[in-house]
Amino acid sequence: MAKVRILIFTLVLFFSLNVHIHGFYLPGVAPQDFQMGDALMVKVNKLTSTKTQLPYSYYSLPYCRPEHIVDSAENLGEVLRGDRIENSPFVFKMRESQMCAAVCRVKLDKKTAKAFKEKIADEYRVNMILDNLPLVVPVQRPDQDNVVVYQHGFHVGLKGIFAGKKEEKYFIHNHLTFTVRYHRDIQTDSSRIVGFEVKPFSVKHEYEGQWNEKARLTTCDPHTKRAVTNSESPQEVEEGNEIIFTYDVDFQESEVKWASRWDTYLLMADDQIHWFSIVNSMMIVLFLSGMVAMIMLRTLYRDISNYNQLESHEEALEETGWKLVHGDVFRPPTNPELLCVYAGTGVQCFGMILVTMIFACLGFLSPSNRGGLMTAMLLLWVFMGLLAGYASSRLYKTLRGTEWKRNALKTAFMFPATVFVAFFVLNAIIWGQKSSGAVPFGTMFALVVLWFGISVPLVFIGGYIGFRKPAPEDPVKTNKIPRQIPTQAWYMNPIFSILIGGILPFGAVFIELFFILTSIWLHQFYYIFGFLFIVFIILIITCAEITVVLCYFQLCSEDYQWWWRSYLTSGSSAVYLFLYAVFYFYTKLEITKLVSAVLYFGYMLIVSYVFFVFTGAIGFYACFWFTRLIYSSVKID
């Protein structure tokens, strides 16, 4: 009867709340309706290159400019990504196609010609935005018929041999054929933009008479319906040449609705690979789960039963294995404060990644919310300082520490300071290259304010709460005199077992890691957080189980120094992550500049460091729970 009343109350509460529920859109991603003839303002973003990894502002090149350049408001994530979104002279009218619209004429001097040549040689791409949709170039996949993939932006130009000449020349894409796809509402006749594509061409424009804004081009003419369809007579980049920038825009009605407009961009042709990755990782998990089950259900049960049935202390001493180290297994490790700091920081990383994954799977961090992912991760990291302080102080008190303020101070500064110094050095390198990817001083100051103003106080609050709580009691008493550790077999060597322990966690994620690195360094879309969340769960289970198994073998060999080894065992997967990053650099990337290589390895070192702290904490807490569980079941006289 009580359950029925609870059910009725729940239903009444639900329907009463449901009356006040209204749908909403995330800021900046709400649909915008356009009537025929409404102005469509195209915005320009950074110039990007996979060869240099150094973004530059669109107007760092002498492109056509509007009368006044206006910077768009950007969130923290966009600034850190190097986005520089500005207005442009490209203005369309909704559902009104244009042909051969002249934007401006630019005469190249030595400096501007050199700037264009450098960007063309480094294969820079121009990025634009219309109604929050990025500009893409549709390209047919050579290995699959009727499969089109979309590339971010269009190349500034191309380099090659033309008209039988022996020397390589530089040619600029000065004519853009835009295609704007829209979905029309029949009832209101309003339209929503669902696609923004371009085909770039290099055309040496010609005109009659003197140049002015209304000069009639002979190479493309809307009056005679002469359109640009190829680059048979390309525009060469050379000092003294004049370049006329033009564009066409064609509006095409589409059946794709606004809510589904990103599906085309995010369509993955590699789903089978992701499923293979998950199945492969699940096999690893099942194998490790079988080993853990065997240890817990057979070996431990038998050992504990036999141990508890021994009649005398002398008989207990004759036993070998993990039971003999019960008087030393909870002896505090060397440098316990550092272990507490890293354990607490690992909990902070875990909380940040977990909540970010949940938000991403719910769609809050979609690509339409540009910069949202990085902004969310930073803010979550700051607020998870509460968990870091709490976890660190709880462990610190368990290890009989007394200076909780010093421990909290180290937790608040050690890991963030290391990452911040590395980030500051890399940012200085980017600044030296005059790249727009350099984080401005104001943003850097905002990061410091978030760190000192929010994260550090939260770490101390968490530390205070954690230290006030009584420390969990050890299941067994610790002997006053440490037990001598016998000579270990070669396969139980700490370095060997630690490195072996990191292979399986890395094996669970390395296929997904390939797609993540590709999205970051080759500027491709990544929005398969469903797959990633499954892999994330598999990684947690794998880290926990492999560390528990190796910890059990270590205790069976009468080595009770498991504290640091448990952290390093799963954390060593970060070593393999960095080695894979090196492999990826030499096999997939075409980076040629030393500065770009330094940036790549610098950022991958930071990522590997975060991965080490995150996976290390998982393995450590798994062993912390495991040792307390098995030794609490042993009867000690």
Curated annotation (Swiss-Prot):
Record membrane topology: Multi-pass membrane protein
Coiled coil regions, renumbered to chain: none
Positions of transmembrane segments: 275-295, 345-365, 371-391, 412-432, 445-465, 495-515, 528-548, 567-587, 594-614
Gene Ontology, cellular component aspect: endosome membrane; Golgi apparatus; Golgi membrane
Keywords: Endosome, Golgi apparatus, Membrane, Signal, Transmembrane, Transmembrane helix
Motif Golgi retention signal location, chain numbering: 635-637
Signal peptide (UniProt feature, chain positions): 1-23
Ranges of the Lumenal topological domain: 24-274, 366-370, 433-444, 516-527, 588-593
Principal place of residence: membrane
Pfam families: EMP70 (PF02990)
Motif Endoplasmic reticulum export signal in this chain: 626-631
Cytoplasmic topological intervals: 296-344, 392-411, 466-494, 549-566, 615-637
UniProt free text on domains: The C-terminal KXD/E motif functions as a Golgi retention signal, certainly through the binding to the COP1 coatomer.
Family that this chain belongs to: Belongs to the nonaspanin (TM9SF) (TC 9.A.2) family.
Annotated protein name in UniProt: Transmembrane 9 superfamily member 10
